[in-house]
Amino acid sequence: EFRRVLFRSIKAGFPADKIVFAGVGKADWEINLGLDYDIFCFNVESVPELEIINELAAAKGKTANVAFRINPNVGAHTHANITTGLAENKFGISIEDMDHVIDVAQEMQNVKFIGLHFHIGSQILDMGDFVALCNRVNELLDKLEARRIRIGHVNVGGGLGIDYGHPDRQPVPDFKSYFETYDNCLKLRPYQTL
């Protein structure tokens, strides 16, 4: 539950204004807790969730930072049950709906659209999947720039995998190559952070 994670994070020394609340099915009390602690942002999965965050922030006289979890329609070469970035997966806002959701958010008084969030799955062994994600993110950032929309926060991911069946055949992807993939392939603007 979010309360435990938030309190443990703060106790461990993480400032609340660096915490991102991600995940489906956020309860109102969890959103209120995030608002009370002025967390960095909420990763929003849908328009109804965006509307709830706006309403709860309005009741507190606050503005909540939001990033949209976009479903990039990028497949990860992993088990079908743990992919999260294909159009048929239930997670996030579809690419086709992104412009509409941004327009909805810009009309709201108590949310501020600050970023995009992407996650393509877990147990990923092929770094090419992350390159494909970067290419899609670059397309969307170009699209935002064409609309003169500046966001400062880009959050990308997917879980690195281990080939448990054949551990010697394929080495575990390392964090260095994982982060180098993003560094080499993402075309962030000078005002954006990853």
Predicted segment positions?
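Glycine-rich tight-turn/loop motif centered on a GG-T
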Residues: L35-F42, A80-I93, D126-F130, G165-K176
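Structured alpha-helical segments in the cores of large, soluble enzyme domains
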Residues: S9, A22, N71, I95-V111, ...
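Conserved radical SAM core fold
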Residues: F7, A27-E30, P72-E88, I120-L125, ...
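Short, small-residue-biased leader/transition segments that mark boundaries at the very start
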Residues: E1, V5-L6
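Conserved anion-binding
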Residues: S46-K112
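Glycine-enriched alpha-helix->loop->beta-strand junction motifs that scaffold or abut catalytic
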Residues: K11-K18, L33-C41, A58-T63
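C-terminal active-site-proximal or functional interface alpha/beta core segments in diverse enzymes
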Residues: S122-L194
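Structural preference for beta-strand elements that scaffold enzyme active sites
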Residues: K18-V20, I39-C41, T63-R69, K90, ...
